[in-house]
From Swiss-Prot:
Keywords: Oxidoreductase
Family: Belongs to the short-chain dehydrogenases/reductases (SDR) family.
Upper lineage: Eukaryota, Viridiplantae, Streptophyta, Embryophyta, Tracheophyta
EC number: 1.1.1.-
Tagged with keyword Oxidoreductase: yes
Organism of this sequence: Arabidopsis thaliana
Gene that specifies this protein: SDR3c
Protein name: Short-chain dehydrogenase reductase 3c
EC top class, as a word: oxidoreductase
GO MF annotation list: oxidoreductase activity
Domain of life: Eukaryota
Active site: 156 (proton acceptor)
UniProt-listed PANTHER family: SHORT-CHAIN DEHYDROGENASE REDUCTASE (PTHR42820), SHORT-CHAIN DEHYDROGENASE REDUCTASE 3C (PTHR42820:SF12)
Binding site residues for substrate: 144
Length: 258
């Protein structure tokens, strides 16, 4: 495949200030899109937009747990660019590993608010904007291999299972408008979300590589962004309701408690 895969497209990327979202913002604009980076990390988000170029990217501060802010972010995008073609709902949070006997339910509420409710709010308002303009749009959500297995991150795992259900439900309803809804499910990636002060990105990558199936390479945020680009573009024109794994075969080989 060659050429600009998102030429003339207008894209919102949530969680676009760092990690997978920032890589996607750079990649999508390289393929001809104009991108609105949405995040609560204002300084980081502004920096990503500036480095990409003000003619290609802009930043909008938004807390995805606040539906009014979500609606305003979509309105900002449509008023600035005249339409919305693609939503990459990528914002997410992760809690520390803990025993279920010590499950922090207040933290669980926060995780569900960001990872599920926040995605639902953006899908809702992005779809409304697409329908209003008659746009056959694409909505892509970052899920996880955790949506296929169990694990110690109980709140995160539950949220990603819920997000896949949301994707499937939205797919069934929005298809009549020509809107596609899909998920991209990465294996573990060293990003600011998964890294901690005492653990370097390289240490995380070494750990993930040891647990992974596909050897000889390490999954990077840029690899996930490439799959998001595929799902956002017309290359996947008849794909909807899918949760596409980017896991090197992990979920088909590894037991859930490995």
């Amino acid at each position: 495949m060659s050429g600009l895969r998102l030429e003339g497209k207008i894209v919102i990327i949530t969680g676009g200030a760092s990690g997978i979202g920032a890589d996607a913002a750079r990649l999508f604009t390289d393929h001809g899109a104009k991108v609105v980076i949405v995040d609560v990390q204002e300084e980081l988000g502004q920096n990503v937009a500036v480095l990409i170029g003000k003619d290609k990217a802009s930043f909008y501060r938004c807390d995805v747990t606040n539906e009014t802010e979500v609606e305003d972010a979509v309105k900002f995008t449509v008023e600035k660019h005249g339409k919305l073609d693609v939503l990459f709902s990528n914002a997410g949070v992760l809690e520390p590993l803990e025993s279920f006997l010590d499950f922090d339910l207040e933290r669980f509420d926060r995780i569900m608010a960001v990872n599920v409710r926040g995605a639902a709010a953006f899908i809702k308002h992005a779809a409304r904007a697409m329908v209003e303009k008659g746009t056959r749009g694409s909505i892509v959500c970052t899920t996880s291999v955790s949506a296929e297995i169990g694990g110690g991150h109980h709140g995160y795992t539950a949220s990603k299972h819920g997000l896949v259900g949301l994707i499937r439900s939205a797919c069934g309803d929005l298809g009549k408008y020509g809107i596609r809804v899909n998920g991209v499910a990465p294996y573990a990636v060293a990003t600011p979300m998964t890294s901690h002060d005492e653990v370097t990105g390289k240490q995380l990558e070494d750990y993930f590589d040891a647990k992974g199936i596909l050897k000889g390479m390490v999954l990077k945020a840029s690899h996930v962004a490439q799959v998001a680009l595929f799902l956002a573009s017309d290359d996947s024109a008849y794909i909807s309701g899918q949760n596409l794994a980017v896991d090197g075969g992990y979920t088909v080989v590894k037991p859930s408690r490995d």
